[in-house]
């Protein structure tokens, strides 16, 4: 079982610097995208990403400085809600090894990352357009490349399933049809409030991080074993779940 998670907007360069030991699979493609992004003005970046002028300047400067010679480990660089529960910095050696083999971070700029892949600070969400590039969007740019890489890695590991713990925005970069015979499992985490159930964004992100860690620490390899996930008070709901859409409820 290969595990997919999203990156995060919030970064921790200090923690990640000097910890990278591997080169991203799609470094050439990242360089191509960074070259395109380098041509964007601060105003364009602000509009494309829906961010403030201050953040637009920061990211304009990041693209200008991007060299392809990253020094920060991807797994330690990202610092959002998913990573507060995943906590790669606290993995023991066995879990680190499992994460390097099985955990993959989807990225708008780098495509697909291992925890120790060397990256530079950036912001480029997967759902964005790419003015100046004929693909038009990041989905168009990546096409089936990411899915093909996952299929190749799954074959090398001898596994038959992918645990999708990424957000909808990032999961769209991995079309199920492009995964061939691999089974795509996409858990859903719901909160029960006042007699109704719904997905709450922050809670779902943390639950995805917690499940990723739980799977790695416990050596979970079969989809059926995911039913045992109870971290954070969640419980598997057999009545509303489907084989490729297990639902976990808390409340």
From Swiss-Prot:
What domain of life does the UniProt record list for this protein's source? Answer: Bacteria
Q: Where is the signal peptide?
A: none
Cellular component GO terms held in the UniProt record: cytosol
BP-aspect Gene Ontology terms: response to hydroperoxide
- Matches recorded under Pfam families: H2O2_YaaD
Tell me its family.
Belongs to the UPF0246 family.
Recorded protein name is UPF0246 protein TM1040_2658
Q: Which species is the source of this protein?
A: Ruegeria sp. (strain TM1040) (Silicibacter sp.)
Q: What is the lineage of its organism?
A: Bacteria, Pseudomonadati, Pseudomonadota, Alphaproteobacteria, Rhodobacterales
